[in-house]
A protein has these predicted regions:
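Short, small-residue-biased leader/transition segments that mark boundaries at the very start
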Residues: 1-3
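Alpha-helical segment of the N-proximal tetratricopeptide repeat
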Residues: 11, 22-58, 69, 75
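TPR/TPR-like (Sel1-like) alpha-helical repeat modules
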Residues: 93-96, 125-126, 155-161, 182-206, ...
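Structural motif corresponding to the intra-repeat A-B loop/turn of tetratricopeptide repeats
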Residues: 42-44, 77, 110, 147, ...
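Generic helix N-cap/helix-start motif at coil->alpha-helix transitions
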Residues: 26-34, 49, 60-67, 94-102, ...
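Structural register within alpha-helical repeat arrays
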Residues: 37, 69-70, 103, 140, ...
């Protein structure tokens, strides 16, 4: 597929380029350019980014970094079955667990909340870094809601990290918790937590302030 001439592949981080060294020089350049295009288009044209992900994986299917990039591109484009396939492959190759929350969310997207919960309860989850651990909580709570288990969703999100105000995931966690409370019919508590969420949301990425006043 067509790639702009100005995209050279040199734009990739050195650590990613280093993982392409096992490829021939010509193939490495092709793959690198496709990976750059994923980054270029992932926000503005996720379907095009996904196509570049497919192309990159076609040229370098044995490299975890390539399969993972293709998986994330497919996920952002809403192609959950493909995303799950690519992320599973990357996980098998590298053993890296950081993509487990996205894999669980893919299962939700495919209408498999029980599979999402099974993944959320797997022993490997204990190896997640804190941001991914929080993301897995949010995904698991969503799976509970998919099953109609609204109180269980609240319980899933109840954790000491709700008091955190500085980490990048704090806003998402508080919002998910407030939304779960609201869905469970606990309106007063939900408003309180939407207000706490709004305190962190200075740039108004969410509608927390509005929902706190409902």
């Amino acid at each position: 597929m067509c790639i702009r001439d100005r995209v050279t592949g040199e734009e990739l981080e050195k650590s990613v380029r280093a993982e392409l060294l096992s490829l021939s020089a010509e193939n490495a350049m092709v793959v690198a350019r496709h990976l750059v295009c994923i980054n270029l288009y992932q926000d503005t044209d996720p379907q095009l980014a996904h196509k570049h992900g497919i192309a990159a994986a076609h040229h370098a299917g044995r490299l975890a970094v390539v399969r993972e990039s293709a998986g994330y591109a497919a996920y952002r484009a809403g192609h959950y079955e493909i995303a799950l396939k690519e992320l599973r492959a990357a996980h098998r190759i590298s053993g890296d667990v950081s993509s487990l929350p996205v894999m669980a969310d893919c299962e939700r997207g495919l209408g498999n909340p029980l599979k999402a919960l099974s993944l959320a309860g797997s022993p490997e989850v204990k190896r997640l870094a804190k941001p991914e651990e929080i993301e897995m909580r949010i995904v698991a709570a969503g799976a509970r809601r998919d099953l109609g288990e609204l109180e269980a969703a609240v319980v899933t999100l109840t954790c000491k990290e709700l008091n955190d105000e500085t980490d990048e995931w704090a806003l998402r966690l508080r919002y998910a918790y407030a939304d779960a409370l609201d869905a469970a019919g606990r309106k007063d508590e939900a408003r309180q937590w939407f207000a706490k969420c709004a305190e962190l949301d200075e740039e108004e990425f969410t509608d927390a302030a509005e929902r706190a006043g409902e």
